[in-house]
Amino acid sequence: MKFLTSILILLNSFLIISQENWTNLIGDDLSNWEIKQGTAEFEINDGVITGTSLLKSPSTYLGTKEFYSDFILEFEVFVEAGLNSGVQFRSLNYPDQKKSVYGYQIELEANNPERNRMWTGGIYDQSRRSIFLYPLSVNPIARSAFKVDEWNFIRLEAIGNSVRTWVNGIQCSNLIDDTSKNGFIALQIHSIGKESLQGKKVKWKNIRVLTKNLNQNRYPVEDYAPEINNIDNYLTDKQIEEGWKFIFDGISSNGWIS
């Protein structure tokens, strides 16, 4: 009985320490954030950050003043139907350009008739390669995870060259990419081209980030979320376990005969 009690005390202590290591990114005001690129407005009320879509404005970002490299990010988000949004991470600014924000983005895509992709949780490379690095076409199970006009729980793990996402507990992305290693986190209000979308809103709450003890806090990888490796001349642990190996080292002709 004493042994069981000791175990429970240790587990409770670990949970308390784990909770204490998280940093809440939403305060009483937006003093730790800054507007980037566009002119859409953000406001904070009762712990909820709300961004309002604005016609004739480029995409607008509310970015953290602090930069983050390796971290776990969790938040809840509510996207009104018809809007496209996202959260930038490890992102930077191009100097003296209108489309200044670039870097990785977690897609937040409310279902609309023109797109009908439902790729929320996928990884897009904003204003750089300008492609989906992890499209949910490779992970169809994840396409139904996001709920439009409801609060959704999002989790991002950006640790080393590994980027993984979850939407409402469903793993969406499992990406290996090393293009960006550090940068700000930013909430996006995407540009709109229709008056019917004017004034629609995206809301975020309970945004928190973990920068310590990351490996101990990682979620397990699901088999239905295939790994995509974008790094040249690099094999992941999973690929090595599957038996992949290089037949050309990228430098010499070792192992080849003429």
Please report, for each region that a protein language model flagged, where it lies by residue.
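Bacterial Sec-dependent N-terminal signal peptides
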Residues: M1-E20
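Carbohydrate-interacting regions of secretory-pathway proteins
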Residues: Q19-S258
